[in-house]
Amino acid sequence: MPVITLPDGSKREFAHAVSTLDVAADIGPGLAKACIAGRVNGELKDACDLIETDAELSIITAKDEEGVEILRHSCAHLLGHAIKQMWPETKMAIGPVIDNGFYYDIDLEHKLTQDDIEALEKRMLQLAKTNYDVVKRVVSWQEARDTFAARGEEYKIAILDENISKDATPALYHHEEYTDMCRGPHVPNMRFCQHFKLMSIAGAYWRGNSENKMLQRIYGTAWADKKALSTHLTRLEEAAKRDHRKIGKQLDLYHMQEEAPGMVFWHNDGWSIFLELERFIRRKLNQYTYQEVKGPLMMDRVLWERSGHWDKYSEAMFTTSSENREYAIKPMNCPGHVQIFNQGLKSYRDLPLRMAEFGCCHRNEPSGSLHGLMRVRGFTQDDAHIFCTDDQVQEEVSACIQMVYDTYSTFGFENIVVKLSTRPEKRIGDDAMWDRAEEALKQALRANNIEFTLLPGEGAFYGPKIEFTLHDCLDRAWQCGTVQLDYALPNRLGATYVAEDNSRQTPVMIHRAILGSLERFLGILIEEYAGRFPTWLAPMQVVVMNITDKQADYVQEIVKFFKEQGIRASFDLRNEKIGFKIREHTLRRVPYLLVVGDQEMENKEVAVRTRDGIDLGKMRLEDFATKIHQQISLRSLKLLEE
């Protein structure tokens, strides 16, 4: 007689084993109709799975995040159902859930076209609208293998042979005549899967191994209702307009080419923004009392072996050799910073020691994962490492948190999601050390009134971690900032200080990044602002245009004056109509367009308009310079009089 405890604390007693769907029906027909799955004692289960003992139960509907993920997974099976009807010879590989959607990798000789994708989507909708039940069967490993062998599904057989124990009992999900294998859970009925869209086709190697066969990957998105789907598609359209690769080319900020995959060729205007970002962070370092250092780009393999990176990270490291010595180009800055710390005797009076670097790092990312500035092989980290005592951890972490929020707010990012990853099963140190470390991070977050989500077991083996994920104007999540405690690396690399009692102690090391990769953060900013950078960041802040040749000398005097004032300015003296010039510089997203005619020259004025077409009227040159200086010094996100 199981007793089911619901989230509100109420209890329901049943005379026999019940499913989540049974419990939902006992509560009411509306909930039964909405029920997708259940969370039983913290574990997601299919709505049909029986609960035989007392349990805590949360009923999952499409209003829950887990419910949407489940219906996305079921849409992947629906896609498989439709594919097998249209191309029965297809071999199905894997179909997981991804952010905002799903994909399915298939082996099909016929190369799918956009017309095929549209036909597939239509067939999927036809199938879903029949509202058929999804039937789950738990079978033996051998029965599952026999089922897929009879259907010629070689990839499913490979998964069973290579990834699933022979004493396991896999779950088979039957979509009418189509059968798939999955951990689940899945929707009980296809009425939940009617708001989706197939998005694109790409190539993907089986198991991600380039030595294996290339499969076709079909991407889709799925949502709980029509409105959510429409909102997402609108956001995707806006994201396409804001694509940093497209805008980067339009504004001549940077380029990338085949001879240097994942490496950025910065052009003048892009490098101007990069340097402004660097200057901004450098001022923050000074404000928060950091030393700035510079370590070598390349170090001997021996050091990477001592740090542990060679064992755990060597596949992602670029290497070279000279004079019978093997070197690695650094993928991160931390081992180099420990070497700097180790130069000279350190006392407890020297701690905390905050060491920062704009470190040029390289990682051998797979070529298929490279994506503009967002995923590169060569990048610059705004990396810092704080060497401190156990007692100083909370205060130092608190200062890091303040620095993160102070920095993000400058760029207009206010929606920050914070996660705290705690001790994993495999870890160094005793429980007392982890208790102190985790509590210090929690107290630092609470002291700053930061709400956070715990991720139990997700910390690194050498210490707990705080992650900061910012949400942009399209509500996309970008994980940028981290604060990571490290109780291992200082010890491995022999970092010590003399404690107050004259004993030698190992410092705690705090890894801290704010922007993460400057390249990636700049890509985020390009998309956030759609290339319309705030004045302080804009590569060109002012362009001055003449109406006739009579004003040419005066225009050049104005630009010289602006440059002496530290304002990034240029002139346009081309023999073109003023309307043409204005349109061109508006497309270049220059914040301020200044026009000079005879009257402006006579009165030592400029006619000011913004890139948004707002006419700010005539201003004396000095008045405009004062206003724009104030805007730059405040790092305002808005233009004058907006």
Swiss-Prot record:
The keyword Ligase appears for this protein: yes
Catalytic, as annotated region: 243-534
Keywords: Aminoacyl-tRNA synthetase, ATP-binding, Cytoplasm, Ligase, Metal-binding, Nucleotide-binding, Protein biosynthesis, RNA-binding, tRNA-binding, Zinc
Residue intervals of the TGS domain: 1-61
Keyword Metal-binding annotated: yes
Residues binding Zn(2+), per UniProt: C334, H385, H511
A biological process term (GO) from this entry: threonyl-tRNA aminoacylation
Catalyzed reactions: tRNA(Thr) + L-threonine + ATP = L-threonyl-tRNA(Thr) + AMP + diphosphate + H(+)
Cellular component terms (Gene Ontology): cytosol
Primary location class: cytoplasm
Pfam family, one: TGS
Cellular localization per UniProt: Cytoplasm
Function: Catalyzes the attachment of threonine to tRNA(Thr) in a two-step reaction: L-threonine is first activated by ATP to form Thr-AMP and then transferred to the acceptor end of tRNA(Thr). Also edits incorrectly charged L-seryl-tRNA(Thr).
Subunit architecture: Homodimer.
HAMAP family, alphabetized: Thr_tRNA_synth (MF_00184)
NCBIfam families: thrS
Name used for this protein in its record: Threonine--tRNA ligase
